[in-house]
Each structure stands twice: as structure tokens, then as C-alpha cells.
Amino acid sequence: MTSTLVLASASPARRQVLRAAGIDPVVRVSDVDEDAVAAALPPDTAPATVVVELARAKAAAVAADIPEYAADCVVVGCDSMLLLDGELQGKPHTPEVARARWAQMAGRSAELVTGHCVLRLRGGAVVAEATDCSATTVHFAKPEPEELDAYLASGEPLQVAGAFTLDGLGGWFVDRIEGDPSSVIGIGLPLLRRLLGDVGVGVAQLWRHPAR
């Protein structure tokens, strides 16, 4: 019975979502060039497909390099991006880009899309795959100039999709959301449960203390 979930992500937030939900994931970070994967897709690729393909690339890269778990495990890859004005926005990386993003999205709403890929490994091979995308509408507040300065100086928004977090300092500047909160953080529990079921794994198998 599968009892190991390998998270193909360096995101502390994704790891914490799983831990809070009873799963202690094994963390393995892929070396996937996300920009190269996205650039290889046709220009008119739907946003949901873009994030799913990125999630699949991450999961596949990790699945190919975990011999110690390959006998029986599931590998989960995720990728999140913010869809605003018809354009996908990833991590800003610099304060200047993050400031420009906030100038664009403050006081408005945007859609946070998160691609998920679940691979089931058995006997060293991938025997099942399930993918899907979750979408959550985020309504942003208008930070005061000094608040935005402080937020950018914290460094938090530089390495997260859309230049904001829901579960950190950025939560002060989110008025409300429509959809799954865990998906905004980076890994949607309701969707992940369904995808695990699609590859034949019940979520309770993965809990630290299975229900009796």
C-alpha cells in the first residue's frame, strides 16, 4: 500500500499545507528550467495547460531520480501563476518587477491558476498519471505606499507567483478569494485528493496517523 508522497517542489508553503493536512512529504526539488518548458509550448496555449505542463515536467524530473522511493510512492508536482489582463505572471524575482505587478493588480481581481500532476510509481516505473488545474479568484486590496515599500523590502513577494502570498505578509493585502484557499498557497487539497484517487491512492493512506 502506497504510503509515501514525494513533493517535487522547494516551496515551504506547499510542504506546510501538506503537513497541516496530516502528510509528511518527502521533498525532492527538480532542476526543471520552467522558462524553457513554457517557451516550448505553442503561443496560444491555454493558461491552465501551461501550469499543468510545468507541474508535469517537475513531477517527471523527480520521478526519474528517486530510486530509494520508486518501488511504491506518489510524486506530486505543482506550478502556480497569476492570470491578470490575459497574461500569466510568475515570480517577479526583483523588487522593481514586483512593484510594477502591484501597481497593475492593486484594487483589482485576478485568477491564480495552479497546475497539479500526480504520478504513481511502482516497481521503479510510472504506472499511472493524473493532472488537472485549479483556479481561484483573488480580490486585492490597495496597499498604502509605505505598506508596499515594507512588503517589497521583506523579500517575500519576490519568489512567489503573482508577487503575493495568502499565508504570509501578503495576506494583509487580499480582500477576499473565491475558491480554494490551499490552491492559492500553491497546492489544492480538494483537487489533490481527487487526483490521488484517480491513480488509485486514498488520501488516508498518506496520513501520519491513519484513521481507525
From Swiss-Prot:
GO terms under cellular component: cytoplasm
GO biological process: nucleotide metabolic process
Primary residence: cytoplasm
Annotated Gene3D superfamilies: 3.90.950.10
Entry cofactors: a divalent metal cation
Entry keyword annotation includes Nucleus: no
Location in the cell: Cytoplasm
Active site per database record: D79
PANTHER family listed in its UniProt record: BIFUNCTIONAL DTTP/UTP PYROPHOSPHATASE/METHYLTRANSFERASE PROTEIN-RELATED, BIFUNCTIONAL DTTP_UTP PYROPHOSPHATASE_METHYLTRANSFERASE PROTEIN-RELATED
Function: Nucleoside triphosphate pyrophosphatase. May have a dual role in cell division arrest and in preventing the incorporation of modified nucleotides into cellular nucleic acids.
Protein family according to the UniProt entry: Belongs to the Maf family.
Entry protein name: Nucleoside triphosphate pyrophosphatase
Source organism: Nocardia farcinica (strain IFM 10152)
